[in-house]
Amino acid sequence: MDSTLLPFALLCFTSFFTLTNPLGTMPVFLTMTHGMTDKERQAIVRRATIVSFITLMVFVFAGQFLFKFFGISTNGFRIAGGVIIFKIGFDMLQARYTPMKLKDEEIKTYADDISITPLGIPMLCGPGAIANAIVLMQDSHTYAMKGILIGTIALIYLLTFFILRASTRLVKVLGETGNNVMMRLMGLILMVIAVECFVSGAKPILSLIHISEPTRRSYIS
């Protein structure tokens, strides 16, 4: 067994779980579904997780095409993705992570179909998760790693489905303090992952600048 598979699987799981953040989504989900029955909530959660998974899979497999089409370098995307993920992690560390701010009138507007937006996109499948999916797909050099990535994403959304379905009971068990502690811990993990992502993108660019500088000087002289 390849020794890199387990660390890669752990990276996929921790990063996607913190970015999807089903525990942090629970209070918002309960607010948006206030007055609905458990059956209605379950239907919304099922559709939201399916929509999120399909959306993420589109970016996983179409990431390379999008890079070529828009002329985006992998390293540049790593840097931008690192910044986005770091900002999300920082907000979570402050226990003030809000995937999407909703006013009362907006909640009523989305009540008919909140499973797609805002619950599915961007709460469960936001820019951070999309950036993370594309970057990790770039790092998947073997079919085994690609399989682990896809399987982990499927597992995360399966867990998200069960967590949100049981959100009423979990909120009572965790309480506000427990939810804040969990959010801060996941935020710290996310910030570390973001720094690694940023550095991995910045290193090749800085190396090119360092190599090209002597060449430019010799050309001028």
Residue ranges and their predicted role:
Residues 84-105, 193-204:
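Transmembrane helix exit motif
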Residues 42-96:
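Membrane helix-loop-helix hairpins that form the core translocation module of multi-pass transporters
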Residues 9-25, 75-83, 148-160:
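Structural signature of hydrophobic alpha-helical transmembrane segments
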Residues 1-18, 95, 102-120:
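Small-residue-enriched transmembrane helix starts and helix-helix packing motifs
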Residues 39-64, 140-172:
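A small-residue-rich subset of transmembrane alpha-helices
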Residues 37, 58-81, 160-204:
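Transmembrane-helix boundary and interhelical-loop signature of multi-pass inner-membrane proteins
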Residues 209-221:
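Single conserved hydrophobic/aromatic residue that forms the stacking wall/gate
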Residues 8-58:
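Juxtamembrane transmembrane-helix termini in multi-pass membrane transport proteins
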